[in-house]
Amino acid sequence: MAVASAAPGSIFWKQLLFSLLVLILFCDACQKISLQVPSHLRAEALVGKVNLKECLQSASLILSSDPDFRILEDGSIYTTHDLVLSSGKSFSILLSDSQGQGQKEIEIILEAGGKKVPKRHMKDAVLRRTKRRWAPIPCSLMENSLGPFPQHVQQVQSDAAQNYTIFYSISGPGVDKEPFNLFFIEKDTGDIFCTRSIDREQYQEFPIYAYATTADGYAPEYPLPLVFKVEDDNDNAPYFENKLTVFTVPENCRTGTSVGKVTAIDLDEPDTLHTRLKYKILQQIPNNPRHFTVHPDTGVITTTTPLLDREKCDTYKLIMEVRDMGGQPFGLFNTGTITISLEDENDNAPYFTETSYTVEVEENRIDVEILRMAVHDHDLPNTPHSRAVYQILQGNENGTFKISTDPNTNEAVLCVVKPLNYEVNRQVVLQIGVLNEAQFAKAVNSKTTTTMCTTVVTVKVKDHDEGPECQPPVKVIQSEDCLPTGTELLGYKAVDPERGTGEGLRYKKIQDEDNWFEINEYTGDLKTVKVLDRESTFVKNNQYNVSVIAFDADGRSCTGTLVVFLEDKNDHPPQIKQEELTICRHDKDYVVLEPTDQDGPDNGPPFQFILDNSASKLWTVETRDGKTAILRGRQDLDYDYYTVPIQIKDRHGASATHILPVRVCDCTIPSECRMPSKLSREAALANVFLGKWAILAMVLGSVLLLCILFTCFCVTVKKTVKKCFPEDVAQQNLIVSNTEGPGEEVMDANIRLPTQTSNVCDTSISVGTLGGQGVKTQQSFEMVKGGYTLDANKGGGHQTLESVKGVTDTGRYTYSDWHNFTQPRLGEKVYLCGQDEEHKLCEDYVRSYSYEGKGSVAGSVGCCSDRQEEEGLDFLDHLEPKFRTLAKTCVKK
């Protein structure tokens, strides 16, 4: 059993060393075996083979004491990596039996090849006879051998058989490797046998090793390498790499044009007669005429004629054969199908189905289709070789017609794009030609003499009353600038084509931007209604446009444009658009004047600049290039504003005097001048206005002031009125109380009522009205004969029905007097109400309210309004049950 090797230092290696140590200590030694090996051993090289069964019959564990070697189950010794043996090397094979037979050890001694003798000792070397090594015998096996099996292959013999009893064995592919058990050897005779037939296409050769060992496992010979080569048998027929192959070739191609190359495969041994292939064409479909041939050795298919015509046959099929053995009749063969498609060429010119066409169209019709023409083309449809391109060769010098191709039907579509005039031309003859998108390629056998087919189209124009004509569409007339009003100008003239004159036509102006003209309805002439001005913003490039419509009696019309070209007149003097000039003393002591002239160049520069006598004392002006001038102070001027009168003339003397505002400033550039400009100051004054928020603030302020004055007036008037309590005051009163909590117990004679305080009186401002008079809040109350007043010391407002008259009382009693008066009476009445509830409930009584107070506008408010009696609280004795909750609330619990 083979054991995988482990790297030194690993855990597995440590365990392996421990196992070897145990085996060495407790195992018996078998016979030593010496093996002759070369001094250099490659990795996985076979060192030798040992008969392990002679030492231990059944070994379950096979180990090597040296990690440079590994031992197989059959006793073969292999290296684990490349080794260089300078001298002998020894190691042990350790065998262990799990059935209890013990452990065995086989010592292996490797003897390296002969030592090299230094050159200086070459003469001292003794010539010795070396032992002849058993040489391999060349051997081969026939593929697909019929036997009988086992079939004798070869015999190996070792010269050591003269001195030892030699046993032979083999290993390698076919023995202990795939394919297993193909070869075996008789260990006594060395005869090697083959057990079955071999397929060379699967195994070309078998490299195996033969071993010669003694009974005790000694190997007196090196392993003998044997190579059994399998001789090829022609058992594989060639076949085409692709069963169906498609080639393409242009039609009408030259003779000898390569169509394609076919390739076949033969699995037999290369470079032998078994793989020497020959190609030939067995059949061409269709067969007549024969167009193709194939090279027998290379398989290249070529054309044999230039007469390939796709329109006759677009596809050919070739049945081809490939045969080995150089094409001999006894060689193996196979067939395949080759499809050759012909590529279309533009070898057929399109042609019209009709030689001539006739069509009618009404005059003045445009963008209308008048005719469709079909063509035939034998080339491949929907390709550049068959798509038609039409041309109008003659008769369309004015561009009246347009011809195009319908992409769906390939027809020619003839259209009218400009109106036809029956009065000018009643019939038009067109010559139309057709070509393909692709260039024409004439075939060898073609009889075509021209590549373009033509046809004739006769277009007859039908008469139609189309109305007036405005020809030309734009008419130009010249006029002087500044032409006065009332001047007549030649207008636009239209023509009726039916009559050849403009008689009976009417004219109307449809566009006149600045309304300069009026038009004569019958003649179309213009008359000025404004002075013509070339410098107007409506004039572009000295031209002013007027659009005119001409119409006949039937309402048919045409439109024309009249361009009035205005000749320039020197009617505008030079102007300076610079509103204010700034001289920065720290930059330069002058300013540049740049006048403009609205007139044309002939009435413009050069300009002449003349200072007024008053201005020439402080200023000088210098003309630079006839278009600009420099204004400079004669001396250093103070920082201030200046006005400089200056006259500017053009080349013809038209002039104007300008007052130039100039500011001399302490700055570097004009934008840094801190001195506000005259224009900005004037603009600031002109732009001052009241905004909506300012107006609103003023209105609200006025209203607030009026309110304050009115309040002060009212307060002053109230202080001057004598406050008194009239004798005829009403006996019905309402007591204001904000108390929401319960009162004392019913049996308690003292009923404490809360007071209501407010600081509003301190501000002397009315907080509510009753009957149109101001009412102030109360601080303390007093009851006198049913009336309630405020304490005068507190300054509170009266809260009675008489308050509607504006009468207030400063109060006659204090709060304690009022409290002492009402407390015992309320308690007594509540008690009596509870004692005689049944009787008092069923009493039906009437209260008199004969006197309600002088001037009162309201009726009585209850039975408690009787102020004539001081003890006027008897009504509390007759409270109904629904008032019990109110009574309990007023009693302190």
Swiss-Prot record:
Propeptide intervals in chain numbering: 30-132
Annotated organism of origin: Bos taurus (Bovine)
Matches recorded under InterPro entries: Cadherin-domain_protein, Cadherin-like_dom, Cadherin-like_sf, Cadherin_CS, Cadherin_pro_dom, Cadherin_Y-type_LIR, Catenin-bd_sf, Desmosomal_cadherin
GO MF annotation list: beta-catenin binding; cadherin binding; calcium ion binding
Free-text function comment from the UniProt entry: A component of desmosome cell-cell junctions which are required for positive regulation of cellular adhesion. Required for desmosome adhesion strength between the granular layers of the epidermis, as a result moderates epidermal proliferation and differentiation. Is therefore required to maintain postnatal epidermal barrier function and normal hair follicle morphology into adulthood.
Taxon lineage: Eukaryota, Metazoa, Chordata, Craniata, Vertebrata
Keyword Nucleotide-binding recorded: no
Name assigned to this protein: Desmocollin-1
Pfam families to which the protein is assigned, alphabetical: CADH_Y-type_LIR, Cadherin, Cadherin_pro
Positions bearing carbohydrate: 163, 398, 545
Entry-annotated residues carrying Phosphothreonine: 383
SMART domains assigned: CA (SM00112), Cadherin_pro (SM01055)
Post-translational modifications reported in the UniProt record: Isoform 1A is phosphorylated on a serine but isoform 1B is not.
Every Cadherin domain range: 133-240, 241-352, 353-470, 471-574, 575-682
